[in-house]
Amino acid sequence: MPAPFVHLRVHSAYSLAESTLRLKSIMALAGGDSQPAVAITDTSNMFGALEFSEKMREAGVQPIIGLECIIADSRGRGEVVLLAQSEAGYEALCRHNSRALLDVEGGDDPMIQLESLAQDNEGMILLTGGAVNGFVGAAAAEGQTALVDERLSALVQAFPGRVYVELQRHGLDVERRAEPVLLNVAVAADIPLVATNDCRFEKRDMVMPHDVLLCIGNGRKLAEDDRPRFTPEHYFKTAEEMASLFADIPEAIRNTLVIAQRCSAMAEMRKPILPPFESEAGLGEEDELQRQAKEGLEERLHGHVFSEGMDEAAREAAAAPYRERLEFELGVINQMGFPGYFLIVADFIQWAKARDIPVGPGRGSGAGSVVAWALSITDLDPLRWGLLFERFLNPERVSMPDFDIDFCQDRREEVIGYVQEKYGFDKVAQIITFGSLQARAALRDVGRVLEMPYSQVDRIAKLIPSNPANPVTIAQALETEEELRKHRREDEQVGELIDISMKIEGLYRHASTHAAGLVIGDRPLEQLVPLYRDPRSPMPVTQFNMKWVENAGLVKFDFLGLKTLTVLQRAVAFLAQRGVEIDLETIPLDDAKTFEMLSAGDTVGV
């Protein structure tokens, strides 16, 4: 039987350095307690919206997509929770969150103007915020009843029938001061109540590791009295515990179920979405790809396959396997629905080459495509080197094609700028990545927070085997490293260091930007995914990481900046100044002098 309560304010590990609740933990806690639904309401972001939706759906728990955000009016600001009721509400949530993050300056908090929210909130429910810094709750805690009335009136007018006065009981004095004020105004204005628990960790005994995590995120020490902290009550309570906590206000518990029943939206996975490729000849994508590929192949055959003195019969014999392979590949590409992808990639590579921007010859499985060779995406003859197209695209293994494309590091931004101009600045974005607390970093950060001697912590951290390709966890190291086990047994402080580190190991610590990946949409990207701003880049960044942005339907294009190409271009330019002309593409791959130079071991790289 479903539990009679739903958590509507849950911070996952995507609330960076604010929560220890991994999505798997939320799934287990809600499912294990038979809670019919659960909301994710991360701080000013929707990083985990799609992943959360899929994981909860797998567990048979209804996902509710939400957001804890700061809203502002002429009197100040405060936090509220927004929940998506419908697809329109989810899209509005993405819009508001994207714009708040893209507009933020410096170290300011992202915020949404109430005026803007009032004009665009179809399909959203609003919870009025807690007593600590809530838009309504904080004013109630300070006894500012006029401001409470004013703000509640504005919210009810903006969200007719979709506002709930939020009550929280974490044992804080501000909550006890705010509650009678909130109850009075809610009853007087006939606004429904709802009980929430601001969930930040799994169980009460996780309060210490959570405190340490907060200190890591804020650069504080555990012993500091004025540091941010949460109470032991900020854990993921069971439905029974919540019902007992609010036994005197049962409607506040019942309304969690009412809200869950009103919410039917979730972030959806989509098939790949690409912008339409506009052919100058007015052809459809399949016909345009066939035209460009056949014309390009003939140029390649004349430049690389046919030799002087070949008669017509010899040329036809040499060309036959290439033309046959081209037709086969075009059939697969069209069958799988990817002609537009090849045309888009070919377009920006041809643009770069026309402007003497060095482009790599091709690497990875994409080098096995004759179509890619014909379009000048790659410069390697797949038949000459026996490369297989099926490693790149295979109808039996449906996945997006993925060319690894290298550009001169100094001029990569020019190519990205061209793509932005061609498809629209609001339709192109970089992809987010998340840095996590791996074993050694976790130990060092926890040691700093606990104010342990650096030399001692460093010695312990170095007992974790270093393997960047497959990082070793603390638990794995304890199985193999006797010295680490000995320190844990014999030194109580080291034991505490290791135990806390194990509990926060793997949690996300910060967000950054994927080094090469870009997505290009067929519409403004905020209509498809929430967006984020990396302070180090002027370009928008998707809030979903590479795996989940592709599941959301966006296609990744790699724009890798390769320093080697820059060095080669400069070398060719320096030689030209001395009257020596070199074409890198015509240097034979079996050049003896090149191998002699490489064998001497005097090169930086190959």
Give the positions of each predicted feature.
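Alpha-helical scaffold/interaction cores of sigma-54-like transcription cofactors
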Residues: 1-606
